[in-house]
C-alpha cells in the first residue's frame, strides 16, 4: 500500500499510539484499533494440510474467516498461503512434465485463478482502514505492462546446419524451407525486427529469455550458443533490452548445467555490452524455466545458488491465470527453511502456448482473455506480465492471426 509502518509486540506502546494501528492477534487490545483476528497458520512451524472453506466477500473469494474482526478474514494468513505456494509443498501428483498440476490448486478449484486476488484483497483492506481512519492515505504503485519473450527456437530453418535441415526436409518436405535457405523469403520465426519496431513505437521495455543449452535434446532445440548466428542475435538484443536465461530442460535433470548456461549467457551479454567479466557477472540475471518446469522449493533453491536474481516462472505451463494469486513482484519465501530469500519473483498470467495448445483458443478468444487480464491488473495498479514466443509472432501459417492480435493488444495497453 506504499505506507510506512512499525511493528511492535509491546501492548502498552500499541495502546498509547494515537494514529492508525492494526492489531493482529487472538484478542483485542485497544478500543481505537483495527483488529484482525489471527489464524494459526503464521504461528505454525510444520507444513500440513490446512482446513480451508471459501466464502464470498465483496463479490470475491476469501478464506480463513474471522468472527470478531474488523476485517472479514485473516488477510495476512490467506495471502501468505497463496503467495508462498504453501499447497505446492504438500504431497501431490504431478502433470506429464513433472510440474505441479494446476487443477489441484485452490485458485483453480474455487474459480479465482483468473484474478490477482491478493491485490484485490489489499485494495479492500486499504478502503476498510480508510473508513476507520480518515487520515490514512495509501500510495498505490502505478499499473505496469511488462512484455517478455521466450526464444526456444530462434529460427525455423536458418542456421541449423546441413544435417538438421536435410533431416527436417525428409520428415516434412517443404518448399518454404528451400525458399528460406536460398534467401527467397524470410524465416517464419524471424520476427525480431518487427518486435523492435513495435517496442519503439509504444515505448516498451521487454525482456528476452534465451535458451542456450550446449547441446540439443528432445525439449531443447535452439540454435547452439557457439554458433555466430546465436551470438549475434543475443548481442543485438542485449544492446537494447534486458536479456535473461531460459534454463534448458536438460538443466532440470543435470543440476550442473544451470550454472554453466548462466555463465554462457553472461559471456554473451559481456560481449554485447563491452563490460568487464566481473561487472557482467554482478549484473542481475533474470530467468524463466523452459516449459515452466520447476518444483518448490528445490527449483527456486537452485536458482538462488546459481545467482539468478529474478525469476519469471511463477505461472502455469498448462493454463493461464495467476498461480500465486498476485500480480506484483515479491520476494520468495522458502517455506522449507522458513526464511525470506533475495530471489525476486515476477508472476506472469498469460502465455501464448497455453492459449493455443492447452486452452484451444483462436486469436479473437485470446484477445478477449488478454483484455480481461489487462482490466483486472489496471483496476488494482498491478503489473501485467505476458509471455510470447517468436514462432507465434512471425509468418508461420500455423499461427495466422496471432501476430495481428498481439499488435491489437499492445495498442489497447497504451490507451
Feature map (PLM): residue ranges:
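Conserved hydrophobic/aromatic pocket- or pore-lining residues that grip, position, or stack substrates
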Residues: 150, 246, 303
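Residues within well-ordered alpha-helices
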Residues: 195, 230-233, 299, 373
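Active-site proximal loops enriched in glycine and acidic residues that flank catalytic Cys/His/Asp
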Residues: 210, 247, 288-291, 307-316, ...
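Terminal accessory/targeting
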Residues: 1-225, 328, 335, 339-415
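Acidic, His- and aromatic-enriched active-site or binding-groove loops in soluble protein domains
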Residues: 167-176, 226-246, 307-315
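Metal-dependent polysaccharide deacetylase catalytic core of the NodB/CE4 family, i.e.
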Residues: 153-157, 193, 200-294, 390
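Catalytic domains of cell-wall/extracellular-matrix polysaccharide-remodeling enzymes
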Residues: 251-339, 397-398
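Glycine-centered flexibility motif
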Residues: 2, 111, 240-244, 319-323, ...
Amino acid at each position: 500500500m506504499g505506507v510506512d509502518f512499525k511493528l511492535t509486540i509491546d501492548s502498552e506502546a500499541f495502546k498509547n499510539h494515537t494514529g492508525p494501528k492494526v492489531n493482529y492477534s487472538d484478542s483485542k487490545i485497544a478500543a481505537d484499533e483495527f483488529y484482525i483476528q489471527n489464524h494459526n497458520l503464521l504461528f505454525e512451524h510444520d507444513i500440513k494440510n490446512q482446513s480451508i472453506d471459501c466464502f464470498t466477500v465483496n463479490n470475491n473469494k476469501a478464506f480463513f474467516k474471522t468472527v470478531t474482526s474488523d476485517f472479514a478474514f485473516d488477510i495476512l494468513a490467506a495471502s501468505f498461503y497463496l503467495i508462498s505456494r504453501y499447497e505446492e509443498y504438500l504431497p501431490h501428483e504431478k502433470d506429464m512434465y513433472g510440474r505441479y498440476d494446476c487443477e489441484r490448486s485452490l485458485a483453480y478449484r474455487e474459480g479465482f485463478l483468473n484474478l490477482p486476488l491478493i491485490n484485490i484483497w489489499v485494495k479492500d483492506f486499504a478502503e476498510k482502514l480508510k473508513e476507520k481512519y480518515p487520515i490514512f492515505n495509501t500510495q498505490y504503485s502505478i499499473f505496469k505492462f511488462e512484455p517478455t519473450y521466450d526464444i526456444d527456437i530462434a529460427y525455423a530453418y536458418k542456421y541449423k546446419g546441413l544435417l538438421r535441415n536435410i533431416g527436417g526436409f525428409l520428415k516434412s518436405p517443404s518448399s518454404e524451407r528451400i525458399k528460406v535457405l536460398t534467401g527467397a523469403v524470410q524465416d517464419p520465426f524471424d520476427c525480431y525486427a518487427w518486435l523492435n519496431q513495435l517496442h519503439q513505437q509504444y515505448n516498451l521495455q521487454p525482456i528476452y529469455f534465451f535458451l542456450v543449452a550446449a547441446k540439443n535434446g528432445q525439449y531443447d532445440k535452439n540454435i547452439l550458443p557457439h554458433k555466430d548466428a546465436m551470438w549475434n542475435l543475443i548481442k543485438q538484443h542485449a544492446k537494447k533490452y534486458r536479456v535473461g536465461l531460459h534454463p534448458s530442460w536438460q538443466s532440470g535433470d543435470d543440476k550442473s548445467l544451470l550454472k554453466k548456461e548462466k555463465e554462457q549467457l553472461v559471456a554473451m551479454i559481456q560481449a554485447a555490452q563491452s563490460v568487464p567479466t566481473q561487472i557482467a557477472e554482478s549484473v542481475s540475471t533474470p530467468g524463466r524455466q523452459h516449459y515452466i518446469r520447476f518444483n518448490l522449493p528445490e527449483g527456486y533453491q537452485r536458482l538462488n545458488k546459481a545467482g539468478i536474481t529474478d525469476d519469471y516462472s511463477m505461472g502455469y505451463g498448462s493454463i493461464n491465470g495467476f498461480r500465486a494469486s498476485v500480480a506484483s513482484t515479491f520476494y520468495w519465501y522458502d517455506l522449507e527453511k522458513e526464511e525470506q530469500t533475495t530471489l525476486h519473483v515476477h508472476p506472469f498470467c498469460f502465455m501464448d502456448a497455453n492459449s493455443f495448445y492447452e486452452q484451444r483458443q483462436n486469436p479473437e478468444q485470446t484477445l478477449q482473455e488478454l483484455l480481461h487480464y489487462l482490466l483486472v491488473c489496471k483496476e488494482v495498479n498491478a503489473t501485467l506480465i505476458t509471455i510470447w514466443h517468436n514462432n507465434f509472432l512471425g509468418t508461420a501459417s500455423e499461427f495466422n492471426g496471432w501476430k495481428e492480435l498481439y499488435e491489437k493488444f499492445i495498442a489497447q495497453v497504451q490507451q
